[in-house]
Amino acid sequence: PSEPFLACLDTPRHREIVQWFTCDKVLTDPNFVTGGASVTTDEYTEAHGGIGICYETGEASDTSRVNQVIDDIRGLMAHLKITCDESRPTPLREREVFELVGQIIVTSNGFRFAEGWGKQSWEPFNEGDVIGYHGENPLVMSSTGRLVFPKPELYWTEGNRVGCLARKLNQ
């Protein structure tokens, strides 16, 4: 299973809500790196005055976190005074907050991940790391960050994304 995370903006209003969810990471995309425009459900909700949050809990076939998600929602609802649940948990600690800053796109030269890269989301990289190649040209990281959403090679086609790059916002 993949590591759970919350996808949303990073504002005080959002932090009030995300404190009730059991995961360690928040991924924000204020510059629409993933879609080039407002294309996700959380972005749509934001565009219409709501607080949009997407709780990515893992692969669709992995139902091991269902009870935890229910508990998280109950805690949030009690906090918002939608229910009178006296057994609500306490808010969670600070999370790591990351911002999407770029995409890795397959070029006419193709693409391949360097040995050991592209196996899972949230892989940390450092400035100077070579994480892949466009043909024979290395993809060298210009800063520290994380590789997120690496796609299996089956889905790699010219002009399409094979992964995204994120930088940590809070230290």
Task: Annotate each language-model stretch with its function.
Residues 1-171:
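Structured catalytic-domain cores with a bias toward divalent-metal coordination
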